[in-house]
Amino acid sequence: MFTPEALSLAEGLVSPAYIAQGSQATARRSKLLTSLLSERRLPRVGWDDASIESFLHEAAMMDSNTFLDNVGVGEREARVHSPLVRRRHYGLAHGIGRSGDVAAEQPKAAGSSLLSKLTNLLVGDAFRVAGLEDAGPALVLPLATGMTLTLTLLAMRSLRVAKLAKLDASSMASANDARRATRVIWCRLDQKTCVKAVAGAGLELVVAPTRLVGDQLVTDLEAVRAAILDESRGGPNAVCCVVSSTSCFAPRASDSLVEVAKMCAELDVGHVVNNAYGVQSRSLCALVTKAWRRGRVDGVVQSTDKNFLVPVGGAVLVSPARDPALTDAVRKTYPGRASIAPSLDALITLLSLGAAGWRAKLDAREDAFEYMRARLRATAEAHGERLLETPGNPISMGVTLSALERDLARIDRRASEREAGDDDGKTSRRGGGKTSVSFFGSMLFSRAVSGTRVVVPGKTQEVGGITFHGFGASHDAYPVPYFTAAAALGTTREDVDAFCARLTKAFADFRKKAEKDAKRFAAAKGDPGAENGAENGAEGRDQTLL
């Protein structure tokens, strides 16, 4: 607004010395934008909110719906009824992309197009700072991780089918048989999202089981290879791609990305990595970099909310710089225009953080992880439990609930002895009974602890038409019940301290509840001494525990 001419005229109203001082302040803010547009990477130091809002408002004024004299007579003219909605979106209502390309420029929305391109560039630079090197252009999509995986798999299949179509005449018979390329080899990770992403793409999921090594679940490379080479189901030509994962719930470790990437290169099949919240871990970023340097990785999908501290709704696809074909295909596969909201959230956050702030967040998360591991280990041992050893997982950790389960079994035996008059009661509290180990998660949640997961062996669940045994553990028969916690981006030492304090109370309260449940159960069965017996048992619990 304040052009040199306007500033000169302003000197007729306010002292020139004051106007000069004010113009220096506005010029400094203008230089922030000049540097951003010239360097096209994260600013060294984060911007203040006023500078960010000023930039967004000016960008919005470059869109046709904010032109002073614009007359829109089309079916889509970015009309917004509510002033509140307009302010929420800074007047940016055209969205991004065009029908043929989600990253294409819009003639009526120069400002929105500029913001979208800058977001992709800043996200790519944030990846670089986090340790993801040799990456091609990043593509921010207004879809959460699961739907982005579905879109990526659809694009992957189209590339695969196009490649099979180029087979020479001597191979045409086998190519025709396998051209559908509908099989997705998936390294098991018990989250419904992954299964539904494959089903949503109309593809066939082939589950490669995990392998238990110590406490940790790792990639069964032999199972992955066998699934790819299965000639009874078409062999490699029938495979759309392999889907591996980096970030996951303990005791599941990150997949052996380098080995899987080498296998995919050797067998000439695609490879998509689910890196949902892996950007926040430097070690996982380094692992992805190593994988696409040494083998085949077609694309990597990651969430915006988990990695950049923004609301749910966006994800980022990136391919290696030497082969960005999959990202290009997804960009051109997206139907119609897209919402700018997830891109705008990421842009605002990254401008606010700057490179220094982003590094500080990454450092703080790693510190929180080590602190949580030490505190959880001590808390677990104080209650007869132990921290699961999962060195291949740099974000999540697990704690056994074995001692708690043994306590419940002891309480059950005592109740059964009263009820039956003998010592044959050995009811398991894993999956039912008066108080179940699985209730421990509800007890934590009721104490305002969110994010923990209690996994009890033996659960069978069907997801997307596939039956999973031991669902939740990513293994058919994980040997112990456990709960998980994660030191994700934004977690502080204060969070960890509060969590461990509430965890200690939950352990004590859970055992008290189990004793009360046993007392009520026995009383309902007509045992007149049940109440006193349960109270005596509670008093002596510390001596008989474990």
Regions found by a protein language model. Give the residues of each.
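Short loop/turn segments at strand-loop or loop-helix junctions that form parts
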Residues: A93-D101, A208-R211, A486-A488
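Conserved N-terminal alpha-helix of the aminotransferase class I/II PLP-enzyme fold
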Residues: T3-T150, L154-L159, R365
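Conserved C-terminal alpha-helix-loop-beta "cap" of PLP-dependent enzymes
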Residues: T3-P4, E11, Y18-Q21, T26-S35, ...
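Secondary-structure junction/capping motif
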Residues: Q24-R29, P43, W47-S51, S256, ...
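Short, charge-rich amphipathic segments
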Residues: E39-S54, G270, G299-F308, S339-L351, ...
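Short, mixed-charge, low-aromatic patches
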Residues: V71-V80, A104-G111, T182-R188, S283, ...
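Short glycine-rich or small-residue beta-strand-to-loop segments that form or flank ligand, phosphate
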Residues: E105-A109, P137-P142, V243-S245, T400, ...
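Conserved PLP-enzyme active-site core in the AAT-like
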Residues: V14, L118, L122-G131, A138-R377, ...
